[in-house]
Amino acid sequence: MEKYHGLEKIGEGTYGVVYKAQNSDGESFALKKIRLEKEDEGIPSTVSIREISILKELRHSNIVKLYDVIHAKKRLILVFEHLDQDLKKLIDVCDGGLESVTAKSFLLQLLNGIAYCHEHRVLHRDLKPQNLLINREGELKIADFGLARAFGIPARRYTHEVVTLWYRAPDILMGSKKYSTPIDIWSVGCIFAEMVNGRPLFPGVSETDQLMRIFKILGTPNSQNWPDVFKLPKYDPNFPVYEPLPWETFIKGLDDTGIDLLSKMLKLDPNQRITAKQAIEHPYFKETN
């Protein structure tokens, strides 16, 4: 820690306190101080250490770079590149949603970063606008990649704030333990819709409410649109039956190709969701440099 000074607290995230600091050359970094779950004799979880070492190997222009891991007494300190703004703040100040060209650029960058990590068998598991950082050049970078795998998604955040359910896939909400790449794609779809609409698509207040909000818009799953849904632990055959709404009734300012892409991301059945690599090749991006 001696090489960093001028610590300024800039936030409290899912896993700990985040500080802005400088090194001796005046370069800015984001330091995440993470409390570790202890194993025997107070030794940090070997799983945590192993997972974080994998993150250090990830190198992509759309992923926040992890420069260093400092092993302190009861915590790990992760040293990341520092960016000033996150996507949530940007959406909040842009009343009515982002401009279409901006939303398209951010979505493509997000998919590029996601595709890279999925190719390297790393999942995010906790994608949301707060985890997407943006610099002054309009570059989007994904933060906290892999931390959910390393430390688990806690029921409550470090700040005692309930972890948001708004971007969580219906298969996970119904108890699926098969964490794979489609859970990140669902989150990307929710973020895409939020960039376009200027507000969250499924702002649930509990797991049950979250599912009902999804079903009221996309329809209740059945044997036709999701053959394996009955196998999920929290599936209830007595779920209220809703028919899917027309996309144009709840998505504003998106053309037909954009709606087609979004609909492929927000498939109820995870096996039917588009992959990040496939999404990058979608016609929606054909006019994007």
Curated annotation (Swiss-Prot):
Q: Report whether Metal-binding shows up as a keyword of the record.
A: yes
The record's listing under Pfam families reads: Pkinase
Q: Which residues form the Protein kinase domain?
A: 4-285
Q: Which UniProt keywords apply?
A: ATP-binding, Cell cycle, Cell division, Cytoplasm, Kinase, Magnesium, Metal-binding, Mitosis, Nucleotide-binding, Phosphoprotein, Serine/threonine-protein kinase, Transferase
Task: Output the Gene Ontology terms for molecular function.
Answer: ATP binding; cyclin-dependent protein serine/threonine kinase activity; metal ion binding; protein serine kinase activity; RNA polymerase II CTD heptapeptide repeat kinase activity
Q: Which GO terms describe its cellular component?
A: cytoplasm; nucleus
In short, the EC number is: 2.7.11.22, 2.7.11.23
Q: Which GO terms describe its biological process?
A: cell division
Note the InterPro entries from the entry: CDK (IPR050108), Kinase-like_dom_sf (IPR011009), Prot_kinase_dom (IPR000719), Protein_kinase_ATP_BS (IPR017441), Ser/Thr_kinase_AS (IPR008271)
Q: Which domain of life is it from?
A: Eukaryota
Active site residues according to the UniProt entry: D126
Residues bound to ATP are I10, G11, E12, G13, T14, Y15, G16, V17, V18, K32
Cofactor requirements of the protein? Mg(2+)
**Can you tell me which residues the record assigns to a coiled coil?**
none
Q: Which CDD domains match?
A: STKc_CDK_like
Any inhibitors or activators noted? Answer: Phosphorylation at Thr-14 or Tyr-15 inactivates the enzyme, while phosphorylation at Thr-159 activates it.
Residues with the modification Phosphothreonine, per the entry, are T14, T159
Q: Which reaction does it catalyse?
A: L-seryl-[protein] + ATP = O-phospho-L-seryl-[protein] + ADP + H(+); L-threonyl-[protein] + ATP = O-phospho-L-threonyl-[protein] + ADP + H(+); [DNA-directed RNA polymerase] + ATP = phospho-[DNA-directed RNA polymerase] + ADP + H(+)
Membrane spanning segments where? none
UniProt family annotation: Belongs to the protein kinase superfamily. CMGC Ser/Thr protein kinase family. CDC2/CDKX subfamily.
Against PANTHER family, the record matches this protein to:
CELL DIVISION PROTEIN KINASE (PTHR24056), CYCLIN-DEPENDENT KINASE 5 (PTHR24056:SF46)
Q: What is this protein called?
A: Cyclin-dependent kinase 2 homolog
What species does this protein belong to?
A: Plasmodium yoelii yoelii
